[in-house]
């Protein structure tokens, strides 16, 4: 018997779509009236922060855990990094961060305007690192979040 598996959407694309689809006028006005560039890291290439704020997403790890004996569930988790950067100010960085956090919390509680892609069961925040460089006026937070899907193993 051949096992069949569902093709899941790329977890990075799912996180980018979640943030992009829920970034509305409230967040845009909180960060000075300009929506940041939100995309997958490999699609953005090099960008100058002086031209606008950037939110890059990329996957740093993934894993599978078979739940049960024999036929069961494959719990797939991916750790996605959300890299938030601005050259404006620390308060602008905090506003961008608050927007991203609010969207992820809303998705986790299933109250986001646009839901997390249906391939994935949940998204949760893991950590935040401040990687700002005050000498260069480059303000940056790096967030890690975990996105989880479940798949039946035949």
Segments (PLM) and residue ranges:
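A broad, low-specificity signal marking well-ordered, structured residues that form hydrophobic/aromatic
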Residues: 53-56, 80, 123, 143
